[in-house]
């Protein structure tokens, strides 16, 4: 399944004509690409989207900067650099880490 690079791409490709709908569609595609499981811990409970580089630190709404994330990991990670936070977690998985890095590199 192909996830476009940003919500705006859904507008440009005429998949929708509403910017709100474009963002909803983009977020849904992100979740689908991760099989509705948290990229960090693998949970499928209360799934949301996490900016790998937080928006407060310059991160943007680009597919390479977001992952599917459970609300627990999202709150716990907060504004901490993701690798620093992830390496310190008991549930750290080299397989999930590699998938996140691969997604970042595109």
Q: Which residues does each predicted region cover?
A:
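A boundary/linker detector
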Residues: 1-24, 94-106
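Histidine-centered nuclease catalytic patch
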Residues: 39-68, 77-87
């Amino acid at each position: 399944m192909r996830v476009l690079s940003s919500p705006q791409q859904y507008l440009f490709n005429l998949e929708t004509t509403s910017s709100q709908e474009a963002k909803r569609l983009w977020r849904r595609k992100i979740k689908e690409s991760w099989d509705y499981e948290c990229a960090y811990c693998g949970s499928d409970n209360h799934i949301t989207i996490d900016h790998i580089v937080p928006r407060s630190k310059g991160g943007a709404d680009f597919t390479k900067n977001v992952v599917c994330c459970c609300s627990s990991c999202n709150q716990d990670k907060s504004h901490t650099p993701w690798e620093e936070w992830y390496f310190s977690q008991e549930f750290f998985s080299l397989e999930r880490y590699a998938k996140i890095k691969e997604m970042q590199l595109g």
